Structures are given as C-alpha cells and as structure tokens.
Amino acid sequence: MSDSPFFPDHQPIQLPKIKIRRPKVGPGAITIAVLVLLGLFVYAASSFWTEILWFQQMHATRILLTRWGVIAGLAVVGVVLSVAVLRIMIGLAHRHRVSSKRGEAAANLRQYQDAIEPFKKLAFWLVALVLGIPAGLRLAEGWQTVLTWLNATPFGKTDPIFGWDISFFVFTLPFLELVVSFLLHLVFLSLIVSIVASYLYGGLQVVPRPHATAPVRRHLGILAAIASVIIGVQYWIGRYSLLTQSGDNIDGAMYADVNATLPAHSILAAISIAVAALFLVAAFRGTWRLPTIGVVVTVVAALVIGGAYPALIEQFRVRPNARSLNAQYIQHNIDATLEAYGLDDLDYRTYDATTTAQPGQLREDSESTSQIRLLDPQVIRKTVQQLQQSRPYYSFDSGFFVDRYTINGERRDTVISMRELNLAGLSQEQQNWVNRHTVYTHGFGVVAAYGNTITSDGLPAYWEQSIPSKGEIGEYEPRVYFSQSAPDYSIVGGPEGTPNQELDYPDDNAPGGQVSTTFKGNGGPSVGNVWNKLLYSIKFGSTDIFFSSQTNEESQILYDRDPLLRVAKVAPYLTLEQKAYPAVVDTDGDPSTPKRLVWVVDAYTTTDSYPYAQHQSLSSSTVDSRSQSVGQYIQENSINYMRNSVKAIVDAYDGSVRLFQWDEKDPILSTWMKIYPGSVESKQNISADLMGHLRYPEDMFKVQRDLLTSYHVRDASDFYTGGDRWRLAEETSTAATANGVSTATMSSLQQQAVRVQPPYYLTMQMPGQQSAEFSLTSVFVPGGESKREAMAGFLAVDSETGSEAGKVREGYGKLRLIALPSSTTVPGPGQIQNAYDTNQTIASQLNVLNLSDSTVIRGNLLTLPVGGGLLYVQPVYIQGSGGANYPVLRFVLTAFGNRVGFAPTLAESLDQTFGGDSAAKVAGGDQSADKNKGGGDQQNQAESEPSKQLASALQDANQAIQDGQNALKNNDWAAYGESQKRLNDALTKAIDAQKKLDAQSGSGS
C-alpha cells in the first residue's frame, strides 16, 4: 500500500531494466576515429603552433609561453580545486545517504538512486566536471592580476586614509578580490550541489518539514560557516576599494564614505565572522535557530548600516554642508589625479594677453613665426595621393604626420607619410592569389614636405619624394612590408640566384616597366616545409599556400603586419596610441649603414586602481574631429593612472619590434619587466637619430587636456563650486568634410567628439620658455551652458626630445598652461572663425571661388602666443570640381585680437593684420619654395600663369569692393557704379583663372 493519502492504491513506479550492449568496433571505425583525431590535432595546431612560430621568429617565445603557462597553471589549479571540492561534496552526500525512509517521495528517490548506482562514480565525476570546469576557468582570467601581484613594485607613495603604499591598491587589492570572488563562487556552488545531492540521497528532507541528518547538518553548517567567513573578508577588503570607486562627479571616498560606509564595512565584517561561529555551533549542536537569526541580522545590518545609514548621512549631514565637509576629500582627489596623470608639475600662469595689433609687434617672436605650419596633414593627403601615388596600388592610408628633420643643418617641421601597398588599387584582372600574395608584397618609400613652405602654385614643397626615393634623407631601406594597410599575408624570400618574384617599384626604363626584388630579411615564419605549409593553409583558409609552386625552402610568410598589432602581441600589458607614425632614422648609430624606415608607437601603462584619482574613459577622451575612431589596442577603457612608459619601434622592412623603457620611474612597467625580463630595452639604447624623432604622445596629451578642463583649479572649495570650468574648443576647419568623413556610421560618442578641435604639433615658444620648441598644443574656452567662444586657456607641452643618444633633453614633457584673465576678452577659435566669415573682403573673395564650382577648404586653425597676445593662422585650400582634383593652398587667414588678414602668403596676411608691417620672420619671406617642386617642373610652369591671373583678379576684386564702400560713404554714385563694373570684370577673370587651375589639377596625376 502506498503511504500517500491522496492515492492509497498507488504503487511505486517500476523503472524498466535496460540491457546495454556494447557495439562492436571494427577497423574502419578505428581508422575514421584516428583520422578525425588527427584532423582535430592539425586544425588546433594551425592556431597554437603557428602562434609559437610567430613568436619564435620575433624572439619573444618567452612572452607567449609565460602567458600560456600562467593561464594554464591557474586554469589547472582552479579546475582541479573546483572539481575536487564538488566531487567531495557529492561523495559526502552519498556517504551520508539514508535508505530507510518510507513514503512515496522516498520510494521515488530510491528508484533514482538504484538507477544511477551502477554508474554513480561516472555520474559524480561528470557533474563535478560540468560544474567545476567553468568555475575553475574563472581563475585563469586573472592571469595578469596574479603575475603583477607576485612581482609588485612599490610606488613609494601612500594613500591619505589608510597609509598603505599605492602598490597595495594597484597590485595586491585586485589579487585579493580575485581570490575572494573565486572562493565565494566555489563555496556557494558547493552549497548548492551539497543541498541537491543530500536531498537526492535522503540526508535532507524538505517535506513535511525541513530536516537534516546529523552528518548532513555538519556538512552544510561547515560550508555555510566558510561562506560567511569569506563574506566577512569581502566586506573587509571592500573598505579599501572605497578609495578607488567612481563617484557621481568626484571619485574616491568622500565624507559619507569615510565616516559611514567604511565603519559599516568593518561592522558587517565582524557580524559575518560571528555568524560563521553560529553556523559552526549549529553544525555540532543541532539547532539552526541562532545562525538563522544571525543571517537575518546580517541582511538587516547590510541594509541599514551598509545602505540606509550612509545614505542618511549623505542626505542630511553632507548635502547641506558638502563644500566644507568634503573639502579635504576633494583635495585628496585633486592631488591624486594630478599625480596619477603626470599633471603635478604643470606650469600654470595667468597670461594678460593684449588684443591690440600694431606694426612691428612680432619682431621678437621670429623663432615661432618662422616655423608656422601651413600644411594641414589632413587636407594635403589627397594632393599627395594625386601627385606622388605613382601607381593605383600605392596609397597613403596611414595618413600624414608632423615630425621634424634636420635639413642642411636646420631643424625643420615636416609633414611625412609612407607610401604603402594598397591591393584595392589592383584591377579586377590583377586580383588573383599569385599577385595578391607573392608579387605585390610591399610599399615603397616616403613622401615628406616642409611644414611651413609651399610652392608658388600652392603645392607642398617636397624634400623627399618619388619612386625611387630622392631628396634630402640620403640612403635608407625604402621597402614597406609592414604597415596598417599591408595584405593579410605575403609569401616572400628565395634562394640566392633564383629569379625575383616580387614587384619592387615601377620603372618605365626597366624590362616590363618594373623592377623586381626578393625579400632578404627575417620577417616571418618559414613555409619551406610541408608541415608549415599545411598549417598556414588551414590558418588562412587557402589551399594555394600548400600547392603553390611559388614557395621554396627559403620562403617566409609575413602576417600580422599592422605595427600596432605586433607591439600589442609582444607586450600585451600595454595600452597603445591610436596611430603609429613613420620616421626614417639611423637606428644603430652607425653612419656607414643605411637608415631604416620605422613605425614609432607610443605605449602606456594604465590602471583603474589608483586611490582617489579621477577615472577617465579613454574612448571618449582620445576621440576628436580628426581621429574619429577608438583605438582597438586599449587594455582598459576606464583608467585613473597613465604613463607613457614605453616607446616602441617597428621596422617597416622586417617587422622587428623593439621596446624602450621611456619612463624609468613607473612602478607598473617595472613590475612587467620583472615578469618578462629582457623584453624591454634601456633608454640608453636609443640612438641619437631615433631620439630626435620621438615626441610627446597625442593620446596622453588628450587625456591630460580633458582633465584640465576641471583640474586647472587646485583649491578644493573652488573646485566644488565649479565656477571656472572650461571645455575644449570646437573644430573650425572643414578638413574632415573635405576628406569624406561621414557621421552616419559614427556612434553617439563619436558624433559628439567630432566637434572637438584636435591638438596640433608645431614649433613655438610659450611664455616662460627659453626658446621655441616642437610642441603639442590645445585651446580651452569657458564651460557651462552659455557656450561662449572666448579664449579661456592655452595648453602646450614641450615635445622636443633632443638628439643625444640615450638621453632625453631636459625640458621634454613640461606642461605649460596659460589662463586668460576674466577681465579681458580674447577671441577664441569660434569667434575668430566668425570674424573670418563676416569679413566682407574675405567673404567676397571666397564666394568668387565658390562661384567657379571650386570647393573652399579651411585647414587647421593654429594658435600661437606671440606678440603679447594670441595669433591665429589658418591656411585656405581650393579644390576644383571633379574626382581627380585636389586641394592647393591659395590663401592664409590670420587674426590677432579683432584684426584679420587674408592674403596669398603668410607674410602678406600678417602684414595686413599688424598695420602693414608685422616684422615677422616667416619661411623664405613669403613661404614659397619653387626650388622644391610639388608636382614636377612642367606642372609648376604650366600652373604659374593661371595662378598669377587668379591672384591679380582677386586683388582687383578686393580693391573694387573697397572703392565701392568708399564711394557709398561719400554718396558718389558714379564712382560706385564704376567700381561695380570693375568688380564684375575682376570676378569674371578670377572664375576663368580658377577653371584653368581646376583643369590642370584634374590632369595632374
């Protein structure tokens, strides 16, 4: 009879006995199984073994094996511990099983027990593995945390609350949180598994009333006590995490955190330990009442002491007195933020700028005015593409960069770019595997132009150009096998004496119209044997690699060719600059060897655990109107500590990577150098030539300038009121539009950032600086909702590293901030742009160009603190209609105070602004350099006449406008009519001249 009151005649369910027959395994099945296993092994090897080959070729095997070894070790520890604990929990539940219970539920459980009994060991291990493996793998995710804790380097600075060294928060605290999180997860999982297993084996009863046998009670009680202890530890270490937490506006522990939340965590930790003791008592004394009360008390205490009490303190104690009560904690935040981001040595001064422009005012600023950069790297890309591309399969996709080179003994600002390979430029007939992966393998050379000089036709004045490369650089290795736009892989190399397969560069005088070459370096793993060819065929999904006759015993496969990716792989702990920039340098200091073409990569060590420092989002701080993408090699998006600790170079020919310790005081880099000894070279190994091309990194500067919109205020009380907040100036140039940038595919963050003016590299002298130096600059305007565009501050950092081997020039990295007094209104970039737009002379002349179907493109608006005030300079480019046309520099806009200038040359424009004679020294007097032809002698000669006609016509139009205005003032209608006739004639001539220039530029490629 059944014990069930509802179904008295119900009989227990009888499970049918199933006889399992073992299938016969024949030789065919064994063969198939072996082949499947072999296939899986080869497929796996195409990933892990090719990765080993890549790191071996890079001489960085230790970096890979250390990472893999630690990950594997932690995974094994985590999985073994998790699986073992869970298996023990299930085994204990089975050992403490009860088989004498009566009733329907007990009968059904016995049937489950009987059914699983023959396979119990397998079932127990299977459950432990299924649940334990994912739990254990969680530990491996913290491999970097474990390594840095084991090799931690002290910061030598302490936090203001506990007095611990900063390294505790950066290295030790994350490790403790990792361990506590893993253990707590494992204990709770063990509790759940133990409860379920004990129920299935009768040791735990749910109905008609909860009941546990003594062994099960001890089992669960001890587990609950362990969980309670771990929770107590979690509360205790949570006290330290308060100092690194993010706040609504200010990060770190404020008054309520220190005086309410922190003590609450201590109390809750003590309560948790007490509850653990109650669980132990219950485990051996048989009553659950006390631990149940303890759990309830813990929950209530967490809600009241940990939640409600701090909230009440914040609402009724702090908010009415926040300025005074939070003052010392805000000061902690200010001090820590300045230290964490390298802003503690900022040179801050008030700049009483004049807005009056007078003749001769720039006489004392010749060092700055002579290096005013007229070439906008963003705008001239299309110009250089048309004139220097040479063939459709070349491009300048990585962009143009501002650098400085010594030419004829003079240090000159330069705009430079690599000529990279672009397979998209091949015709459809050329798009075959042989061409894409064995013939078209590399780009060739660089194009470099003076930053402050143009030809008479508005073209860049090149000092290095053409294929083969010719100019002022001298002998260097020009082949670009490694770049951002390089093919996904190329197969290169061959024995001595075999025919060259790779296209080197086009040459009309060579057989077939091209010169061929063979790669001679050590740039990639070998594919000279069947095994490697098989692995790489699978890796890249191409049978051509395996069957191609183009490969030989000396063949190498080049892949992972993006310079940023190569640095990221050999230094996975670094956050990288969004872009690498090119340089032609003597890397070994030996003048007898050719120079090398390299990519320079700035790299950072970051953390989000610096106590009291303000958190910054890298994805928002580093995006502006000209970098409308977020770097993909960001290790941490939210950070509160940043150092430019490493300078890396990637050889464009063989892809070799060298890392140099740039910041020798950074504890985070020192820690990683202990982990990977020998992977980072000393700064002393930097050659003199390479040192001269390093610079202050742009992304670091962007983060710093973003912080200085608020943290230029050093007093806690003033900081809290926020009355002197700034914001970054908005972009005024039209370069982004000219280069086809569309906001349609941008995120909301990027659409907002598109308005922010980027920082600019230029040579200039700041107030208090001894001489003009290569600098990185940015402009601030007042914050708030008023959207005033007046100038509020100007920031510059000394970016000149010097040219002494192994030694950085004194003064490098010095940040200088000048603040404009509120009593003086100095026009900001937006107001200057408005002055340009509303100036009748400027507007009329630009309208003439628009009438001729040309496009007016305004370049970067540069700001320089010269003449006792602030000078603005903006190049104006004209681009004809049609896809083959390109921008040429036709005019220069200048402004100082309320005076503006607009003329074909910088010198003329400055003279207009400063009453006829600025006394400024500019490049070549009128910034033209016909001896450095921008597009070839014949083109310059052809363009000279229309250029002169356009300039003359615009001058006539300007004069006619002025005469007409004077005639109106004098009510001389006859003179006004005559001036209008002259204006119409001048406009007609200007339009005709511009059309001729457009036609010539359209055929200039």
Locate the predicted segments by residue.
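Soluble extracytoplasmic regions of secretory-pathway and membrane proteins
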Residues: 3-22, 31-970, 974-1003
